[in-house]
A protein has these predicted regions:
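Phosphate/NTP-binding elements of NTP-utilizing enzymes
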Residues: 1-146
């Protein structure tokens, strides 16, 4: 059984604000998230997840509850294999996609994650969008190096 206070918080939020949660997200919570949390064969690497949250919030900014909710699923495993090896996140213009993904993938590239030479791929609608995301990550890394 997976226990994560950030997931519980988001599930409670969704139940208390049903008009703010779209139909597809409600279906995802009902048919994927809640059954997954009840499984005994899924391991949640809470230590690495907590390190991720701490790393992101100390090197970038305070994360929103929905970010912590989604990030948690990157640390769930069945037989040492990620339950969700790929994530597809669909967000509109100006919603902060770079701010969502850059801290997480940057964490994956640190020794705190524990995987040497971790490979990250970012897919976008255009080469310029991918370059923008890379530039955000690169510029932030320069800031941290100079500190």
């Amino acid at each position: 059984m997976v226990i994560c206070k950030e997931i519980d918080y988001y599930l409670k939020y969704a139940e208390e604000h049903p008009n703010w949660i779209n139909k597809k997200r409600k279906l995802m919570l009902k048919n994927i998230v809640k059954p997954l949390l009840k499984r005994d064969d899924v391991f949640f690497d809470e230590k690495t997840y907590r390190n991720c949250i701490k790393y992101c919030e100390s090197n970038y900014y305070k994360l929103f509850p929905f970010q912590k909710f989604i990030y948690a699923f990157a640390f769930m495993y069945k037989d040492d294999i990620p339950v969700f090896p790929k994530f597809f996140i669909k967000e509109g213009r100006g919603n902060g996609k770079d701010g969502f993904i850059v801290p997480l993938v940057n964490f994956f590239q640190t020794p705190l994650y524990g995987v040497k030479n971790y490979h990250v791929e970012i897919v976008a609608n255009s080469e310029d969008q991918v370059k923008d995301t890379f530039k955000v990550a690169y510029d932030l890394s320069l800031i941290h190096i100079s500190e």
